[in-house]
Amino acid sequence: MGHFHLSNFIALIGILLVGPTATSGAAVSVVSQADSNDICSKYVVQAGETCSAIAQAHSITTADIETYNAQSWAWTGCGQISQGDFICLSSGESPMPVALPHAVCGPQVPGTARPNTWSKLGSLNPCPANQCCSSSGLCGTTPDFCTSAAHVPVALSMSTDTQPNQLTTTSQAITISTSPAIPLQKVVTSSETSSSMTTSTSATTSVPTTTSTTTTTKTTSTLKTTTTSTISSQTKTKTSTSTSTTKPKIVKPWSLTMYTKQDCKGDYYVLQGHNKGYSDTCLNLHGGLSSKDTDTGVSCKWFTNDGKSSTKCDSGALTRPQSWIVETGICTVFSVKDCKHDLHSNAYTPVPKHPCQNRGKFDTPYFVSMNCYTEG
């Protein structure tokens, strides 16, 4: 009996030690982490989502989202997030804001590179003098532009004796996101270049003797020989490369499938392409897009009869899809032709857990034109 009680006692100890650990371990979800460049884990806000719902789905809190995005572009708090916004779900540097095809100022102009100093984000692509850049990336002088929600991240330090919108010639003006600061920097750069050229000319003029000239001639001759050899080598290399050239690597296509009914049922369009990285190419759904399948370009087909029949997208009459699926890439959808900015445009991305997205009240009312690409 003594042995029996000892075994039960040992088993009970094992349950107490192992059981809680296994249970708690199973309940812990993987929390998003910053990438290798210390850029935070980026998330694209979907239609109708709130910080609370996003936080719950990623095992963090709403307060965490507020903290992670304190320095994000145009961040006004969880109460005003919009579909298509890039937000942080982990610690780390903020991501560049989503590019807007129509933007002419600010960091959302297509192709804008990330600044080395994040606090200078607001000074990128400035408007002409006396104009303000709105949160939608347009220049103007009305209160709609000059009281925009877009702003320099809160971490930016400013001199307390410098007032907004005042011109200044001190070096401290560089830390203020005002358009006059940019021309001042260009003038300084130009002056320094000019000074450098003058010094170089002076040094050349000061060569005094014939011996120096002769030496220069020999050096020049040697350089020419070296250059010729290099060019010859490069030519051979290129010839060898062209001989062994293979077909370019096929990029996995992005695609946007749009259905006539909810839950991704009914007739549908399939729009797909292979372009990698953002470009300003606009795709009008009924703009003569090719229906020919390709490994490099864009194609668009209209499927009917349960997918058994297909033709060009121009033949389809659907402009207000009730559901859709985005795969691989990002598609910004506009309710007007030529991807012209309007208040109803939205960016759509894949949703792995629920690929089919049904229409909601915040979605783009009409799918007329698109700007799509894959991030690679």
From Swiss-Prot:
Matching Gene3D superfamilies: Endochitinase-like (3.30.60.10), LysM domain (3.10.350.10)
Note: In plants, chitin acts as a microbe-associated molecular pattern (MAMP) that is recognized by lysin motif (LysM)-containing plant cell surface-localized pattern recognition receptors (PRRs) that activate a plethora of downstream immune responses.
Principal cellular location given in the protein's record: secreted
Name of the gene encoding the protein in the UniProt record: LysM9
Residues covered by the LysM domain: 41-89
Summary of the knockout phenotype: Leads to enhanced fungal virulence, with faster decaying on infected fruits.
Signal peptide: 1-25
Family: Belongs to the secreted LysM effector family.
Protein name according to UniProt: Secreted LysM effector LysM9
Function description: Secreted LysM effector that might have a role in sequestration of chitin oligosaccharides (breakdown products of fungal cell walls that are released during invasion and act as triggers of host immunity) to dampen host defense.
GO molecular function, one term: chitin binding
InterPro entries: Chitin-bd_1, Chitin-binding_1_CS, Endochitinase-like_sf, LysM12-like, LysM_dom, LysM_dom_sf
GO CC term (a single one): extracellular region
Domain notes: The LysM (lysin motif) domains are small globular domains involved in binding chitin in eukaryotes. LysM9 contains one LysM domain.
Disordered, as annotated region: 190-219
Pfam families: Chitin_bind_1, LysM, LysM14_C
Location relative to the cell: Secreted
Keywords: Chitin-binding, Secreted, Signal, Virulence
